Amino acid sequence: MSNEWKEYVSDPRTICKYGAKCYQKNPDHHKSYKHPPNLKAKGKDRQRTRFTPYDKKPFKADSEDVKPQSQDAILDSVTNDDTCAEKLSDSTPSPNNSKEANRLIEDNHDNYYGKETNNNIYKECFQVEMPDDFFKFYECLNEESSSIEHLMASVNLEMIGPFDLLLGKLPKLDNKDLYLVHWRFFYDVPEFQAVLKKKGKSELHIGYFRDNPNDKPVFLAKNDSSKDCIITPVAENIFAAVYWFLQNEKSSSPFMSIACQKLSEKVKKWGESNGYKVEEYEKKSRIKIQICKTFHGAGIVVPYNKKTQIGYRKLVESNANIKKMFQKLEEASGEAEKSKVLSEIQPLITYSSIALDECDFGTGLEAGMALFCSGIQELQSSATSLLSSSYTLLKREEFAKIIQVHMKHRRKGPDVALWGNKIQ
């Protein structure tokens, strides 16, 4: 073994997946990944050239389906100068909203988790830990009533998701991946974790929003998946989020008014006495740190170097144009018409894939979210690939796992618990 190869073997950096075939010129890429000696030698004289997606040529869709399932699949297609046109794909199941289809487990379980407060269990089940205010809020309700669920029902609220673990309602499953789609609504991106829902057939839900799975949530937000994909920040902690809901709900019915007023006073007093401000979220603070707004409106935060401009570049198309293309695809009546629109959308996918390879991970994340938020079946395979790759490269592997499981079991409607519309 030559000295160069010995040095390569002992190099602690991550091995580049493309090895000797790597065409990457970005110095940041070579700092993070090691390459075989022969490539290393060749790379010294290379001039760094960043890809400019705006000097684009018209794309013509391939006649074959391309179904990238991983980061390798996406970037290999770019390496081979392939248009990687992605047409109708059977790899992602169609979203379901039937009651039977929404049920992922049977209701004959006799082994349940206890009322867990150990955050390791939450991490094991949901890939994220729960913040302190989550447990404090449960304490607040537990102090108020022996039946927390009845108390919440009196104000038209339902505790869902990780609260089922606190309530002792979560069954122990062999397939732990299914916990990742327990109460995950149709438009819930991996950053958004629902914890409360308006009772009944409403799809209005409130959840924690995290930019990074290993960080604390940055705010709680609301979404009504029966209407759209918009995620609207409402509060910094769950006390303020519930207070916001109660103030809005008490005006909806005279029968709700007294119960909502009573609980809102309790929540505000208990929250403030424990150091939680009961006030609406200041959206300007979010705008300052987000790299772009995204289709769902809550924005994304990724590392970005202003000097080198590495980390993010704008999408090749404006959001307005992307929405128009999505609408055309939804309205397309035949296979030929769909294929034509898909070929128009393809440059967005291809250029975002190239941006990923040049360390502009935020671009891949933004494009993947746009495809995800479209809710269009023909785009779901591309959405999964772009998002999985982006999260992995951003070292947010937990989010990559969540999106993969979600896309496999993506469901519409209000009954998105593991047990569907069955009452636990």
Language model features with spans:
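Short secondary-structure junctions and interdomain/linker hinges
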Residues: 148, 202, 249-253, 274
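Cys/His Zn-binding finger modules involved in RNA regulation
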Residues: 1-86
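Charge-dense, low-complexity intrinsically disordered regions
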Residues: 252-424
